[in-house]
Amino acid sequence: MAQAFCLRHGEMKPLLTNLPKRSSKPRQTGITLVIDKGLSVAEAENLLSVAEPYIDFIKLGFGTALFTQNLERKLTVYRNSRIHVFFGGTLFEAFVVRNQFDDYLRFLEQNKIEYAEVSDGSFRIPLQEKCEYIRNLARHVNVLSEVGSKSENSNATPAEWVEAINSELDAGALSVIAEARESGTVGICRSDGAIREELVLEISKHVPKHKLIWEAPIKDQQAWFIKSFGPNVDLGNIRPDDVIPLETLRSGLRYDTFATFAPMTERPPEPSKMIVEELADNRSHIGTPQFTGNKSVSDQHAKSS
């Protein structure tokens, strides 16, 4: 995990103290799952050059894997950075609805994919049948299942969400992704982007938190989850350009979570004598401004002109 450090009295010290403790890769909690909707190889490399320490999973969204040029090269770029990559669940559904599940397995094998997402957001798969797909896939790859419809008209109850999540975990899913889409307006979210708080809290009562990845593509949603479940909550559908902003939210270095994690005091502490001495030493090396009496620079300039 990259952090900002400064050299003080010959030792490297964290630049900021009392930051929330963040997990490091390979993580079991605090996962950030990024959605790639068609990045080029160069764009993938650029993303990792600045954000690799903070990314755990990358999903090639919906069916984009079928249209990605240099797919093998991009997959290699991600794997070389210790990032788990998988294809969006909609692609799984596209194979299943055409009765091509065996072709899907071959496609995963051909691309050396070690994780697969099983979802039923675009067309309904009965829970028992979906669990059978999970059991089948789990014999070949690591399975992430996704629960929740992509339709705004879905009216599944909290009890139905909990039943589906626990059934899919029992069938062999490593974790369950709670649906919100890349728009953040369905599933665990309302059409205006607000979190369905009662639903989320009810799910969290009955499912281990480390088994849940909450889709939260919008900043306010991310902040809500971090304030509700802590800096190491697992979040998904994060846009590539939001990876570092999300890390600042997790660390309390953005307004939305600043007060949650800052060691607030009534007034800023007085600078320590040691720091004052360091500043004085640094100033002596770069020189000090020269003044004539108590006159300001502008006064001196006016007189000379």
Question: Model-predicted segments: where are they?
Answer:
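Conserved anion-binding
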Residues: 111-188
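C-terminal alpha-helical cap/extension of soluble enzyme domains
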Residues: 8-18, 201-305
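Hydrophobic faces of well-ordered beta-strands that scaffold small-molecule active sites
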Residues: 29-35, 56-60, 85-89, 116-118, ...
